[in-house]
């Protein structure tokens, strides 16, 4: 970024930015960059060079003599209106001694005469230093195997990092160079202002090409780049005391011994060990310690299977006897609820002390084998913790840490979706630490077949994150990098990437044979020393510890593992161990399976609703609302005041508002949710003159809760996962994710299948997340018609074969894995949303809603429906005794769910049919067995029962409802042998017809079938 416009240099405002003027003439100007003299915009105008130029310019402003004479002339020329930008930069004559094929800039009027050899050398050394800053990581010794990274036959040393490139020879190595801007300025201390060329190169090699390499020059912020240089471009970036080395050794010993112990005791079990990357454990523990020192109170970790058990044991502090009991199989007891999961998927929540004496809450979220799917869940949990701690401004008290595999980080799209939350106002977590456990292989696939970039971490350049590559065999370098990443995140509240390059001792799991596919790689691995052996030899050789001391410590650690192994056979795991988040005062899943909890009321006093109506229909004085929206808002207020004609959006707003007044936080998220895809919600008002915003519900006076509504990025997988994670943190959050159209929710199918449907049964992970899914066949084609109701119902855990006992009926909601509803009235929507929060447990809710019913006259409620009663599982026909006969006169009963009711109502009205009644099933799962049985018994003279749906036969509710309907009929007084007749669209591969005319023809056909029209 070029920032040359200032009060001191106002001339740049009239001439345009320096970068702009140079770009215009780039085709004709030959420019000397920081390495290669080129024609055009190759080097001089790149982002990284711009930062360098900015640095030179600021130094020149303070003291023109502090920069090279060529820079002094250049900046003077740019300040001179008589000299065109194309002539501003003039290279000294002797700079032309560049490698063949390059060309120096032509001389102009700005500089005349000769420049001595020292000037040329100084400028070339500046270019050399910059080349190390930009490309030094390509030469760094970050690969312990020497096969993928660093300089080797496949990756030759970049020419810009060689002395020959600048025309230097061995005779130049002893020449003294002035230190200053562009040449190791932080080494100019203690009276030392010069250094030989050899010393400079040696320092550059140590700083940028040792066991770690840093990519940061892609970051446009000079402040951030300078901050990093202050920490890595210094004589000794890190030096550890004896006590610090003892701590590193101890942590590495525990990590290494853990894998060795499991390998000895359970040689044939899968554990997805961390061998070859054990230094990650002391790295993470350093990250935890430093972050806590800087104010972090909660750390949420997400990772896949590789090394998970080691992290659980050594970082989160899960008892080793608990882990060993899982290997033995002794934890599969009758008193442990849920189906459980394999040991390398389980999560944990634990509070433990750190080296500073402060405590930290560590949470490792449970995860499936769908790699990276836990990433957005972790960030959602972290954001919710920041909210709970009233820290959404500073974002210092909670931290998300994600561990990725190298293949998954580069290959899984949800990684990018998750990183995209970084600066979004309602999704930012103040920066995430990403740790790539890079074993240079993905199952059996080499990196060259798994990604199109040199590093797996290159994706992170999109968010201007620094990328630290570090050799896993150098545990001190690893520890330094993790510490640096913690400080970066605290300072700048942005992401940092740590790419720990190591190897994988075994195959994908311990029973796999990797030499089938990577024979040469595994020959190298067979010769590798373990990380702890490398570090032990270093400590012994430098005299820090004796071999005897180290061996005794290893033995002590091993004996502690043996003790835990003995205790494992009698170990009884506590319920709290598995919980990702502990909800104090809430019933556990085990208690829900045995107790019957009362149904709490969801109705609200009329006075409260009318006060809310005033809030919803007003705005600040001087705020200019769109003229069309004024009418809509006033009608909302009027409907509440008169108590009649309350529409869908108003019913929803009343639910949100009353929950906030009850002390429940409400968060609504998704694409375009502020206005609503169908222009129905208008939760956020925009001033038509200033574009200032006003959110009526956020003005409600309750210190305990607030209302948040946020348009999300155009992502389903990432955002749904984020909101799921948000919902895990506290039961006092109503979190609702809304799809733009229900059809697009399946982009997040992994979150639905692996987390929402099975999270509680597998991991005791409780959530009250609401999925709001627009659904309904309106002739808009196969991409805008269906939220895939059938898929949610297929995931339902209820047994359709048996009518529930009385006890089971009372506990239906407690036993279900999630709920599926398709309400048709604003009042029922109001009660279902309030019911989510007004009970002593939480269950996810798939809430299907009709686009057509948002404004339909048949979808209106009166205020009394909000002040009395509650959610209705089924709604009987309100036309009995009006436009149709009584229940006794009814011959045909049509069961249905959702907006097909409006088409049926219209057809019945046109036919003048008096003997057909409709019964709307508002809640599909748990199924209303008892309510439906009682309703059927109230119709004494039915001749047929029909199920009608607008979806095709192989979609919608039919496959789910058919067995349950027949189970229910067997419990009725008169209809035990009845068969329900299906009326709906024929089976189809596509969701819906693409043309309106075909849509209407299909609808007409099944409506005729319902009423037996010829």
From Swiss-Prot:
EC number: 1.2.4.2
Localization per record: Mitochondrion; Mitochondrion matrix; Mitochondrion matrix, Mitochondrion nucleoid
GO-annotated biological processes: 2-oxoglutarate metabolic process; cellular respiration; tricarboxylic acid cycle
Residue interval of the organelle targeting sequence: 1-30
CDD domains, A to Z: TPP_E1_OGDC_like
Pfam families: 2-oxogl_dehyd_N, E1_dh, OxoGdeHyase_C, Transket_pyr
Residue positions binding Mg(2+): 406, 439, 441
SMART domains hit by this protein: Transket_pyr
Cofactor requirements of the protein: thiamine diphosphate; Mg(2+)
Function: The 2-oxoglutarate dehydrogenase complex catalyzes the overall conversion of 2-oxoglutarate to succinyl-CoA and CO(2). It contains multiple copies of three enzymatic components: 2-oxoglutarate dehydrogenase (E1), dihydrolipoamide succinyltransferase (E2) and lipoamide dehydrogenase (E3).
Description of how the protein assembles with itself and partners: Component of the 2-oxoglutarate dehydrogenase complex (OGDC), also called alpha-ketoglutarate dehydrogenase (KGDH) complex. The copmplex is composed of the catalytic subunits OGDH (2-oxoglutarate dehydrogenase KGD1; also called E1 subunit), DLST (dihydrolipoamide succinyltransferase KGD2; also called E2 subunit) and DLD (dihydrolipoamide dehydrogenase LPD1; also called E3 subunit), and the assembly factor KGD4.
Protein's recorded name: 2-oxoglutarate dehydrogenase, mitochondrial
Organism: Saccharomyces cerevisiae (strain ATCC 204508 / S288c) (Baker's yeast)
Taxon lineage: Eukaryota, Fungi, Dikarya, Ascomycota, Saccharomycotina
């Amino acid at each position: 970024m070029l920032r040359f416009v200032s009060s001191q240099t106002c001339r740049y405002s009239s001439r345009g930015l320096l970068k702009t003027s140079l770009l215009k003439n780039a085709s004709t100007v030959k420019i000397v960059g920081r390495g290669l003299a080129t024609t055009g915009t190759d080097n001089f105008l790149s982002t990284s060079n711009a930062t360098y130029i900015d640095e030179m310019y600021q130094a020149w402003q303070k003291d023109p003599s502090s920069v090279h004479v060529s820079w002094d002339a250049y900046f003077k020329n740019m300040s001179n209106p008589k000299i065109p930008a194309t002539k501003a930069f003039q290279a000294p004559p002797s700079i032309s001694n560049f490698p063949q094929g390059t060309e120096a800039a032509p001389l102009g009027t700005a500089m005349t005469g000769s420049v001595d050899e020292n000037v040329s050398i100084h400028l070339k050394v500046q270019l050399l230093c910059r080349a190390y800053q930009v490309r030094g990581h390509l030469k760094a010794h970050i690969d312990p195997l020497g096969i993928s990274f660093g300089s080797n036959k496949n990756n030759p040393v970049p020419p810009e990092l060689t002395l020959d490139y600048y025309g230097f020879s061995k005779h130049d190595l002893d020449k003294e160079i002035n230190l200053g801007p562009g040449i190791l300025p932080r080494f100019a201390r203690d009276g030392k202002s010069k250094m030989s060329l050899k010393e400079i190169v040696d320092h550059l090699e140590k700083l940028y090409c040792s066991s770690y390499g840093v990519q940061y020059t892609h970051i446009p912020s000079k402040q951030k780049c300078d901050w990093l240089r202050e920490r890595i471009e210094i004589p000794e970036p890190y030096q550890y005391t004896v006590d610090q080395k003892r701590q590193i050794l101890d942590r590495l010993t525990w990590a290494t011994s853990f894998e060795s112990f499991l390998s000895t005791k359970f040689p044939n079990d899968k554990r997805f060990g961390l061998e070859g990357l054990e230094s990650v454990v002391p790295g993470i523990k350093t990250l935890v310690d430093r972050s806590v020192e800087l104010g972090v109170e909660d750390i949420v970790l997400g990772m896949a299977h590789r090394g998970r058990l080691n992290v659980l044991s050594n970082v989160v502090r899960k008892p080793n006897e608990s882990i060993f009991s899982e290997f033995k199989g002794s934890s599969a007891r009758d008193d442990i609820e849920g189906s459980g999961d394999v040991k390398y998927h389980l999560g944990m929540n634990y509070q433990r002390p750190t080296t500073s004496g402060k405590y930290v809450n560590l949470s490792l979220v449970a995860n499936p084998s769908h790699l990276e799917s836990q990433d957005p869940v972790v960030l959602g949990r972290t954001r919710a913790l920041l909210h709970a701690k009233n820290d959404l401004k500073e974002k210092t008290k909670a931290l998300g840490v994600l561990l990725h595999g190298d293949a998954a980080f580069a290959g899984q799209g949800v990684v990018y979706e998750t990183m995209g939350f970084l600066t979004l106002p309602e999704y930012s977590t103040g920066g995430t630490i990403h740790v790539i456990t890079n074993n240079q292989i993905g199952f059996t696939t080499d990196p060259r077949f798994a990604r199109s970039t040199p590093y797996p971490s290159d994706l992170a350049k999109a968010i201007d994150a620094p990328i630290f590559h570090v050799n896993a065999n150098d545990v001190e370098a690893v520890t330094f990098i993790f510490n640096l990443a913690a400080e970066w995140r605290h300072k700048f509240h942005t992401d940092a990437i740590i790419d720990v390059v190591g190897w994988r001792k075994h195959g994908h799991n311990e029973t796999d044979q990797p030499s089938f596919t990577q024979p040469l790689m595994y020959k190298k691995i067979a010769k590798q020393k373990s990380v702890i052996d490398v570090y032990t030899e270093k400590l012994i050789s430098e005299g820090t510890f004796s071999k005897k001391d180290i061996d005794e410590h290893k033995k002590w650690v091993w004996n502690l593992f043996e003790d835990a192994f003995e205790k494992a056979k009698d170990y009884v795991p506590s319920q709290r161990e598995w919980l990702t988040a502990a909800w104090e005062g809430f019933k556990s899943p085990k208690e829900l399976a045995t107790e019957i909890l009362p149904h709490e009321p969801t109705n609200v006093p009329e006075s409260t609703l009318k006060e809310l109506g005033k809030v919803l229909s007003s705005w600040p004085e001087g705020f200019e609302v769109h003229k069309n929206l004024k009418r809509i808002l006033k009608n909302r207020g009027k409907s509440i005041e008169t108590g009649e004609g309350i529409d869908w959006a108003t019913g929803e707003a009343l639910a949100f508002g009353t929950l906030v007044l009850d002390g429940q936080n409400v968060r609504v998220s998704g694409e375009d949710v502020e206005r609503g895809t169908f222009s129905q919600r208008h939760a956020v008002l925009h001033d038509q003159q200033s574009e200032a915003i006003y959110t009526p519900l956020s003005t409600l006076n309750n210190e305990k809760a607030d209302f948040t509504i946020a348009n999300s990025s155009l992502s389903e997988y990432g955002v749904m996962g984020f909101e799921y994670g948000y919902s895990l943190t506290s039961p006092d959050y109503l979190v609702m994710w809304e799809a733009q159209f229900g059809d697009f929710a399946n982009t997040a199918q992994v979150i639905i299948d692996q987390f929402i449907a099975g999270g509680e049964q597998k991991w005791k992970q409780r959530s009250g997340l609401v999925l709001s899914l627009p659904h309904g066949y309106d002739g808009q084609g196969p991409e805008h018609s269906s939220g895939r109701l059938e898929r949610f119902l297929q995931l339902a855990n209820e047994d359709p074969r048996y009518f529930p006992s009385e006890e089971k009926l009372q506990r239906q909601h407690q036993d279900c894995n999630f709920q599926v509803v398709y309400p048709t009235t604003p009042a029922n929507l109001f009660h279902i949303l309030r019911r989510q929060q007004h009970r002593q447990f939480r269950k996810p809710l798939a809430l299907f809603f009709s686009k057509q019913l948002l404004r339909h006259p048949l979808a209106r409620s009166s205020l009394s429906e909000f002040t009395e009663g509650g959610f209705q599982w089924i709604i009987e026909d309100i036309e009995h005794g009006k436009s149709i006969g009584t229940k006794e006169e009814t011959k045909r009963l049509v069961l249905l769910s959702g907006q097909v009711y409006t088409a049926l109502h219209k057809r019945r009205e046109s036919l003048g049919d008096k003997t057909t009644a409709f019964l709307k099933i508002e809640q599909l799962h748990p199924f209303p067995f008892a309510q439906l049985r009682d309703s059927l018994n109230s119709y004494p003279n039915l001749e047929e029962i029909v199920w009608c749906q607008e979806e095709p036969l192989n979609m919608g509710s039919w496959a789910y409802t058919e067995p349950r309907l027949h189970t229910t009929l067997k419990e009725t007084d008169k209809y035990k042998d009845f068969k329900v007749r299906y009326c709906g669209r024929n089976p189809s591969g596509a969701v819906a017809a693409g043309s309106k005319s075909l849509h209407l023809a299909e609808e007409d056909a099944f409506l005729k079938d319902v009423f037996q029209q010829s």
